[in-house]
Every structure is written in structure tokens, then in C-alpha cells.
Amino acid sequence: ESNFKIGMAIR
């Protein structure tokens, strides 16, 4: 789940 949030933030 953490990766998902990080991917959206990096985008």
C-alpha cells in the first residue's frame, strides 16, 4: 500500500 501512495505522490 505504501508503494501505491508513493507512486501517486512521485507522479
Swiss-Prot record:
GO terms for cellular component: extracellular region; host cell postsynaptic membrane. It is found in: Secreted. Contains 5 disulfide bonds. Expressed by the venom gland. The presence of a 'disulfide through disulfide knot' structurally defines this protein as a knottin. This insecticidal neurotoxin targets two types of channels/receptors. It reversibly inhibits the N-methyl-D-aspartate (NMDA)-subtype of ionotropic glutamate receptor (GRIN). It inhibits glutamate uptake from rat brain synaptosomes, and blocks GRIN in hippocampal slices. It also acts on sodium channels of both insects and mammals. Belongs to the neurotoxin 03 (Tx2) family. 05 subfamily. This is GAMMA-ctenitoxin-Pb1a. It comes from Phoneutria boliviensis.
